[in-house]
């Protein structure tokens, strides 16, 4: 298992790169907006299109929580990841045939949203179970892969949109990602109950709240004041981060005065900061502690958010990128730290369900931010 866990991590990384393209929504949105009259039969507003991403993000806690129950019924994480991959792929392919905003909300918002969350929740929770000795770093790497999708694919997406249109792009990527996820999931297994890496002894757990030594289930977690402080902080990080990540393309065009191709590159640069932040802050949190790491990130987000709002009329793409990258880096950092933070605070045994509930904070950010 010591070697096998690395294969599981690599497979999970591939899955998360694929589903992470959902966060390059701003590239899709630009294509849909430009082709709106043909696709929808009328002009559409960017805010109407952005609602699809809001729904996609907002439904995430439901399948993340349900996925842990499905994992038992479907006999392992592999089948749940397959289910997520099929839903995500089907959502993209079905989006290529839509002719109304309502259908966009169903295909991209619900189908893709459920598919992404099923796969994401299982891959993150499962890899953290394989690496209790490196929770912060591994959670950071796993979630970084999710962010990497928004680095690798926007230029490819923009090229496909330029050559064949946005609907063609949905269709091609839907097929590609479906195949990649199904193959990668073949290598995903789960560790035995209570498994520990060879030679590693878990640190003593402070337990003064009446929870079992294995941790707190969701009911005990909801009775803990820390949960509410943690979820509020998660919402704040997600609000600022999703505002920049999901709307990077139109923001770059509006503030920097650049065309869609350059804006797609800006989205990739922001995605790089998002991805790098997940690994960086996951590693930092292992060294200095989860709460100090989050405190530093909070200060950076506050300063960068204020600066970004102050320079919106500057016309400088460089200034926009600097502050957008800082926000994205810390948003990504929170995504990398929170799976480990939740496991540290409430135990690893129930972390799948507990983190799914904690992810409601992210969903709220998805409603507020974009």
What are the residue ranges of the model-derived segments?
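Cytoplasmic membrane-interface "Motif A"-like loop-to-helix N-cap segments
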Residues: 72-84, 287-298
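Intracellular juxtamembrane helix-capping segments at the cytosolic ends
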Residues: 32, 117-131, 138-139, 333-346
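Hydrophobic core of transmembrane alpha-helices in multi-pass small-molecule transporters
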Residues: 17, 91, 102-118, 235, ...
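Helix-loop-helix hairpin linking two adjacent transmembrane segments in secondary transporters
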Residues: 145-193
